[in-house]
Design a protein with these regions (language model features):
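Non-cytosolic beta-sheet module surface loops
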Residues: 8-10, 22, 79, 89-94, ...
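Extra-cytoplasmic beta-strand recognition segments
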Residues: 45, 66, 71-100, 118-125, ...
Length: 186
């Protein structure tokens, strides 16, 4: 089996012409759909004091003040790949953190998460869905009004930001605890 990689094309539908090197008269056009490198799915969301809308370029516009630290917005969607992924936020809003968590078939969080600016992470076995979160990292959240570009992609190398294929997934409020919160004493 041969793999065909298409580069330099914008996401959408196109045709690929495949021709024989032995007999150039033998060729065929194959319709293909070029998908975004950005694996995230998101869209409008509101909850915990924050509101997100989708800009015309596919980035998110986030406004409001989170209700508390580690509160914010989240979107859950089917996991589109296996292997290693990396998360980057080339355009960010100070005081908001982005992460992607791995969920099993029952919606329970599996070990690990991928955070923006961190290393590439192997998707754990049993992952069925991903949960993309934008949470306040401030102890006392302040008002936000800005644009954010986030990209989750396969592999361990981050590339230039692309609009994700799905920017119409409704999101909602999320409240999470950082890993260290699980180890606090009462």
């Amino acid at each position: 089996m041969t793999t065909i990689t298409i580069t330099g094309k914008k996401p959408g539908k196109t045709d690929v012409t495949i021709s024989s090197t032995v007999n150039p008269a033998v060729k065929t056009d194959v319709p293909v759909t070029v998908l975004s490198r950005n694996l995230l799915s998101y869209g409008p969301a509101e909850g915990n004091g924050l509101t997100a809308t989708v800009n015309t370029d596919g980035s998110l516009h986030v406004t409001g003040a989170a209700a508390r630290q580690w509160a914010g917005l989240g979107w859950t969607f089917p996991c589109p790949v296996q292997g290693t992924v990396i998360l980057r936020t080339p355009t960010f809003i100070a005081g908001l953190s982005t992460s992607v968590k791995f969920l099993d078939a029952k919606g329970h969080q599996l070990d690990g998460q991928v955070t923006s600016g961190g290393n590439a992470v192997a998707i754990p076995a049993g992952t069925v869905s991903l949960r993309f979160e934008i949470l306040s990292s401030e102890a006392t959240p302040t008002a936000k009004d800005g644009d954010i570009r986030v990209q989750l992609e396969s592999g361990d190398t981050a590339h230039e930001w692309m609009r994700p294929d799905n920017t119409s997934l409704r999101g909602g409020g999320r409240i999470s605890e950082p890993v260290s919160a699980c180890h606090r004493t009462a």
